């Protein structure tokens, strides 16, 4: 127990270290950049990011929740607070670990895996509109249940 992180927001799952740039990793990186992350793939991923953002924003507005969603290209994240953080410190201070865990478990029980440590999704070349729409429906259900119970802050 003495070795456990004291801060629930501690990043214990990052990737790094001296062996992160080995030959296999570099070959995989080169293949990904040359064969997977093409211009067409980015058009697809960014379009899905906009769709994901719209689904989350619609649920937040429809249920009157003091939350927000932010998108940068194909990366979309929602935070359970009204104000958008301006710095990393703002984001950390505005976290809600209990609500984060709840939404992750709620989504996981319905077939959706969110990025660990925050409520973020990255659209990939393999992501489909059906994947995004599934998340939008599940997020809307969770938002409705939380709003109904007043358990959203």
Task: Kindly give the residue locations of the regions a language model identified.
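Conserved N-terminal phosphate-binding loop of PLP-dependent enzymes in the Aspartate aminotransferase
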Residues: 1-153
């Amino acid at each position: 127990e003495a070795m456990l992180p004291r801060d629930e927001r501690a990043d214990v799952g990052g990737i790094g270290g001296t062996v992160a740039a080995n030959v296999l990793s570099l070959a995989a990186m080169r293949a990904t950049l040359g064969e997977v992350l093409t211009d067409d793939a980015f058009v697809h991923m960014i379009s899905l990011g906009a769709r994901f953002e719209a689904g989350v924003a619609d649920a937040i507005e429809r249920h009157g929740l003091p939350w927000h969603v932010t998108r940068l290209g194909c990366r979309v994240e929602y935070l359970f607070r009204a104000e958008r953080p301006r710095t990393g410190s703002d984001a950390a201070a505005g976290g809600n670990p209990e609500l984060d865990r709840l939404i992750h478990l709620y989504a996981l029980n319905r077939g959706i895996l969110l990025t660990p440590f925050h409520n973020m999704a990255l659209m990939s070349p393999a992501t489909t509109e059906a994947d995004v729409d599934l998340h939008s429906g599940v997020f809307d259900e969770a938002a409705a249940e939380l709003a109904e119970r007043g358990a959203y802050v």
